[in-house]
Amino acid sequence: VYKRQDEINAVVLDPGASVIRGGWAGEDQPRAMLPSFYGWLPMTDEERNLYGTEGLKQEPGPTQDGDVSMNDVENHSKPPVPRGISFDASRARKRFLGDSGVSYWRRGLEIDTPFDENGIVQDFDSLHAMSRNVFDALCAEPTENPLLLTEPADNPRAARGKAAELAFEGLNVPAFYLANRTVLSAFSSGRPTALVVDVGASRVSAIPVVDGFVLRKGIHTQPNGGDAVSRALLWGLTHEMGDKNITGWLADSIVPQFLVKSKQPCDPGMPAKATLREDRLHSTTPSFRMYHTMQ
């Protein structure tokens, strides 16, 4: 499809239970792939006074290199908010978004996700902040680009309405379309009628598509996605499973990378020679440690 020079491309957002992907319509692959998780800390009293009433209407601030938008120049009452950070006034949370938001260790940092165990969005405020972060990664302005947002085949009606509210009232996009990702997968293979097997992080689904429409009564799902495989692997590494000859060794515990201060080489079959960060052992939250253990 040939495009005119003055034509504005649509932004495609594909939020999954593990990764949220963003890119431009017509391209073969996404431009941005960010984790569907975010870190959060309680807002300080100063942050509550400055940003406690902004909520969904918060404007994106400058980058870490100091670039400032015209909105920030005109508004001298509040300091700009760095990209990758947002504030949830309703729950008094300071969110840390993107790879750096969930990778950098901070004292007391919790890890959360807007999705439930079935991959359905439950927290649209957090999804709005993540969507803003994806637009920033694409160097795109939501008010100037149409948005195509994907949804699972069994997305409830209430979630569809919330998604439209997020697009028009939260992001202020000029045009919006909510597309079934199962139908998009079938169309990408040139088949309007297909049986799509979707293996995701939270579950595995077998979904029939006929002439571009999903047969909802024929959907079969199992909660045995990639996360379940990772949990089973973690259990197998830390628990004895009858015949030790199967694995040959048993791990006492899995130590995440953020707890390792330094390492030394050791011979095969010998215990690891690592120095841990003792100061982080008791100030790390269970959610942060589990997230990095499963990576």
Whereabouts are the PLM-identified features?
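C-terminal region/appendage detector
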Residues: K3-V197, R203-Q295
